[in-house]
Amino acid sequence: MLKEWAIKQGILLKVAETIKSWIFFSQCNKKDDLLHKLDIGFRLDSLHTILQQEVLLQEDVELIELLDPSILSAGQSQQQENGHLPTLCSLATPNIWDLSMLFAFISLLVMLPTWWIVSSWLVWGVILFVYLVIRALRLWRTAKLQVTLKKYSVHLEDMATNSRAFTNLVRKALRLIQETEVISRGFTLVSAACPFNKAGQHPSQHLIGLRKAVYRTLRANFQAARLATLYMLKNYPLNSESDNVTNYICVVPFKELGLGLSEEQISEEEAHNFTDGFSLPALKVLFQLWVAQSSEFFRRLALLLSTTNSPPGPLLTPALLPHRILSDVTQGLPHAHSACLEELKRSYEFYRYFETQHQSVPQCLSKTQQKSRELNNVHTAVRSLQLHLKALLNEVIILEDELEKLVCTKETQELVSEAYPILEQKLKLIQPHVQASNNCWEEAISQVDKLLRRNTDKKGKPEIACENPHCTVVPLKQPTLHIADKDPIPEEQELEAYVDDIDIDSDFRKDDFYYLSQEDKERQKLEHEESKRVLQELKSVLGFKASEAERQKWKQLLFSDHAVLKSLSPVDPVEPISNSEPSMNSDMGKVSKNDTEEESSKSTTTDNEISRTEYLCENSLEGKNKDNSSNEVFRQGAEERMCYQCESEDEPQADGSGLTTAPPTPRDSLQPSIKQRLARLQLSPDFTFTAGLAAEVAARSLSFTTMQEQTFGDEEEEQIIEENKNKIEEK
């Protein structure tokens, strides 16, 4: 009996040891497998977040592709619904080892029926309970670890989102500062409005609170991202290629960067001195440093969290999971991002929306805006017409250059024929502007008709029909794109210089310059230099669309002697009479002196050479014309151009050739109604649209060539005109 008992006891001990070894082996394998899944899942989620949030610059993406191509493939892989991390359900699901242990336990109970006694139930129950408790504790630890990894993954996503939101908000704030500075300098969308010495406040004094907030937040975020990147380089080194210091901005000393970044605590006065009064260029430089440093931080973090840097299974412990690395690296960076974002958002919303949207509008002001709404619609339509015509003129000039090159080229016929599709494409590009211009003109006419009908209804007078046949309102076939005169985007503005390019010591201003005191001279010189510097600065900031070479080419094409004598269409020749336009030339401080030379040269040329000219006067000699219909066409074109000449009762109008000028016309007759002016914009059928448009722009203002401000009635211009008249009389 004792012998049998000893044999049974030995069998039970062997079975227990086998079960114990199976349990330990299964738990180790299961633990390693779970840790590996959590590690890889967190790394994939982190890489996917960094790449999807678009916080990396293009050069950093290219560098990542060079150093570790697996990052891009892992980040761009198809993400699961709940991410790459294993879910709690998958962690709680029993694996094959758990099922094997259950079957072994049941088999043992079946094989030993003699142990089915009451005393043995307590032993087997305690063993089963201990196993279940151990299994539940390990499952709880794994679930807690999974929740922690999920939380840090969300923190990383929030940090990347805040970084991108902060960058976009700084860009908007800089645009608001830039737009306010441009407007304060006297710029409008098309032409200058006031000179530099009347600009009011210094540019850095505008939105000073927003400028300070931008500087403080950029400086704090830049320093936090720089310290985090340096910490990663020092405590978590990678290979030599990834740790190459030439690829990092954070290793550049603070003193070389300037802008007060080397100081831990900086006063407002010191920041004012370091940034030249919180100027726009200094803020833009600091913004570029922040963008580069932020992208560098996320690039290094992506290299550190790459799946290739995951430790092997036996060496992987909960202390080596990547969420601990992320927590150690970032430290106070998420808090800095969120605090700076909130501070800048408050300042930006205050300056951007408080005075315009959140301030209550007085009732009288609202009534005034209600009354002028229809007039604003007319202004919007006319302004849209002007911008479409300007764009159309640019396209036509480019097309004309292409045609001149094709005409004068010595290439073969095959190469020339290849250019025909390009010409067709350019003509198709012109068509939308032509249609838009026509639609804007029709819209303006319809709006003016509404105003006239409303005005006549109020006064009780019959409506006066328009005598111009071109005033017929045509219903719009397609909606017209109107360009509203509000809240423009500074990068898309076309600016004209309010700074005179003439040197201050030139003959143009020498007389007035000598009458000034020494302090006034120095002040005027400083203002002149400052205004030139600001102009160049604004051109570089806003992106000046047309280069100087292109503007010079436009000037030669539009206003050269060849362009003046260029024929528009083959009609009967008319002997031109000098156009009295000193008001347009007054912007340049000059009066045309070559009228007599043009008169003599034109008298010797043939009729084919001077079939038509671009400049016509209202008092053309009717005796020299051969056809009455052509006279009407020319008189109509002259009247159209006279609409844009600036009449001044105080300035004497005289031409340079000494010819008799037309008698002064009453001001009321020279200023027709808005409807008649709009009607005259519709050119005669005898004019081609391109030629008529070029003539219209050329006759309208010569100040476009010099990019100067138009001023009327100045004493300086009257003096220059009188001096030129005296010189002509002496000759």
From Swiss-Prot:
Localisation: Cell membrane; Cell projection, Stereocilium membrane; Cell junction, Adherens junction; Nucleus
Region (Disordered) residue spans: 570-671, 710-731
Coiled coil: 382-414
Compositionally biased intervals (Polar residues): 577-586, 658-671
Membrane topology summary: Multi-pass membrane protein
Gene Ontology CC, one term: acrosomal vesicle
Annotated keywords: Cell junction, Cell membrane, Cell projection, Coiled coil, Cytoplasmic vesicle, Membrane, Nucleus, Transmembrane, Transmembrane helix
Biased composition (Acidic residues): 712-721
Family matches, as InterPro entries: Myosin-bd, Vezatin
GO molecular function, one term: myosin binding
Keyword Coiled coil on entry: yes
Signal peptide: none
Chain segments annotated as transmembrane: 91-111, 114-134
Chain intervals with Basic and acidic residues compositional bias: 590-601, 722-731
GO biological process: cell-cell adhesion
A Pfam family that the UniProt record links to this protein: Vezatin
Top-rank taxon: Eukaryota
Subunit structure: Interacts with USH2A (via the cytoplasmic region); the interaction associates VEZT with the USH2 complex at the stereocilia base. Interacts with myosin MYO7A and the cadherin-catenins complex.
Family: Belongs to the vezatin family.
Protein role: Plays a pivotal role in the establishment of adherens junctions and their maintenance in adult life. Required for morphogenesis of the preimplantation embryo, and for the implantation process.
Protein name: Vezatin
Source organism of this protein record: Pongo abelii
Gene transcribed to yield this protein: VEZT
